[in-house]
Amino acid sequence: MNTNVFRLLLLGSLFSLSACVQQSEVRQMKHSVSTLNQEMTQLNKETVKITQQNRLNAKSSSGVYLLPGAKTPARLESQIGTLRMSLVNITPDTDGTTLTLRIQGESNDPLPAFSGTVEYGQIQGTIDNFQEINVQNQLINAPASVLAPSDVDIPLQLKGISVDQLGFVRIHDIQPVMP
C-alpha cells in the first residue's frame, strides 16, 4: 500500500511539474511573439519612411531629402561628385533637435572644402501632394578631406523643432569652396 501511495504521489508530482514546464514555455513563447511583434512594427514604420524618402527624392529637382525615420542614406549628384548622405545621432535638445549629417564621397578622391544649405521642417499632406511647413534653413561648411574615400560628419542643431515634429531634412546647393 505504501508503494501505491508513493507511486501516486510521484505520478502527481511529475504531472504538476510537467504542467509548470509547459507554462514557462508558453510564457517564453508569448514573450518572444511580443518582441517579434514590436520589431515588425518598427520595421514597417522604417519601410514606410524609406518609401516616402525615395519618392520625395525621385520628385526632387534640387537636393536630397532625408527623413529621420528612414534610417537610410540617400545619394546626391553635386558639383563635387556623388555623395551619400544620412542622418545619425538624432536626439532632443533644449532648443530643438541635434543630429549629425554624415556625408560620404563615393569617388576615390578626397572631398574638397564645400558649402551647402540644409533645410528642415515638417511635411503635411501626402507624398504625392505635400507641403513643407515651418521650414528653416542654415548654411553648412566642411573642410577639405585629406583621405579618400572621404567621410564628413557635420553636427547640426535644428532650433525650434522637436524630434517628433521633424519631418524632413533637405540638403542642396553643395558647392566647392575656393581657398
Regions found by a protein language model. Name each.
Residues 5, 70, 115:
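Solvent-exposed, flexible loop/coil residues
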Residues 16, 22, 162-165:
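Short, solvent-exposed coil/turn linker segments
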